[in-house]
Amino acid sequence: MEIYDFIYKIDSFCNYSNNWNIIQDSYTNEKYGYFADKRPIEVLIKNSIINADKPPGPTSHEVAYWIKQMFKVSKAGHGGTLDPKVTGVLPIGLENATKLMSYISSSGKEYVCLMQVHCDFNIDELKQIISKFIGIIYQKPPVRSSVKRRTRKKKIYDIEILDTDKRFILLRISSDPGTYMRKLCHDIGVILGCGAHMRELRRIRSGIFTEKNLVTLQEISEALYMWKNCKDESDLRKILLPMEYATCGMPKILIDDNAVDAISYGAMLTAPGIVAYQRFRVKDTVAILTLKGELVAIGEADVDSQKLVDMKKGIVVKPKRVLMPRDIYPRSWKKHG
């Protein structure tokens, strides 16, 4: 089926692999909704994510606002704040896709950081000091911070020295979201004994979004011009990622057309509505999709997927975030009250 090819593209986006288990044969009625990778451009815009390359200068909110104005949409949100001087990966969700930004914001980050130390140093000693910061660290946000200044526990997954030039060190750092790179550089300098500070910072990954398909504001502007003035939407389609790509790494469940509308109203997903699924465990975050690949909701698994084979009824997933607008698919349930 075409749907599995589309989901394979999504999962390949972050090298995720999870086999499918088919419970029942079903088909989707093309009268309702759209195949997620073939939405009309106007519909795609309202259900897409742009992997923007934030320039130095503006705030993350300003970049999101500019893109909102460019597309003339009612909402745009970003997936993780970058300071004005910081550049790099800034996923922007448009309209319906803004509901997914919290999942991106709470995912791991990766940076390239230029640190300057305040004295000559021995590279082996520096490597030893840096290695001590891999793992759990404790940070207090800087004085000029938008959050409450309390000590926070963060995890540094890896720090790699990419290059050195006199007192300048280029680092690649993988960490929890909300880790302060400026503070990390300062603390490394304290242990070194002579001080250090961050000179430049670029984010190269936010969750599953990397530099691989970054687009600049200029490229967005040019693609919009070609669509509006030359009726050529090809460049715009390369820029607009269907919001379903944000589910890469999540186990997925495909549901029957008759179950879609109830879920869009916030109903629990029960066993009879499931057509196919990837393996998941209790409490896992699961993506619920139509047979056209449209994201209906993201929820929490109430059972282990191994139980699905024998389940004839009962709750499987409790939706936490509904993305499918109501009444797109036909109603096959009775509304009470």
UniProtKB/Swiss-Prot annotation:
UniProt EC number: 5.4.99.25
InterPro entries in UniProt: Dyskerin-like, PsdUridine_synth_cat_dom_sf, PsdUridine_synth_N, PUA, PUA-like_sf, PUA_sf, tRNA_PsdUridine_synth_B_fam, TruB_arch
UniProt-recorded Gene Ontology molecular function terms: RNA binding; tRNA pseudouridine(55) synthase activity
Enzyme class: isomerase
Catalytic activity: uridine(55) in tRNA = pseudouridine(55) in tRNA
Positions of the catalytic residues: 83
Residues of the PUA domain: 250-324
Protein origin, superkingdom: Archaea
BP terms from Gene Ontology: box H/ACA sno(s)RNA 3'-end processing; mRNA pseudouridine synthesis; rRNA pseudouridine synthesis; snRNA pseudouridine synthesis; tRNA pseudouridine synthesis
Keyword set, alphabetical order: Isomerase, tRNA processing
Family annotation (NCBIfam families): CBF5 (TIGR00425), PRK04270.1 (NF003280)
Database matches in HAMAP family: TruB_arch (MF_01081)
Alphabetized PANTHER family for the sequence: CENTROMERE/MICROTUBULE BINDING PROTEIN CBF5, H_ACA RIBONUCLEOPROTEIN COMPLEX SUBUNIT DKC1
Family classification: Belongs to the pseudouridine synthase TruB family. Type 2 subfamily.
Its job: Could be responsible for synthesis of pseudouridine from uracil-55 in the psi GC loop of transfer RNAs.
The protein, known as: Probable tRNA pseudouridine synthase B
Organism, as annotated: Sulfurisphaera tokodaii (strain DSM 16993 / JCM 10545 / NBRC 100140 / 7)
Gene: truB
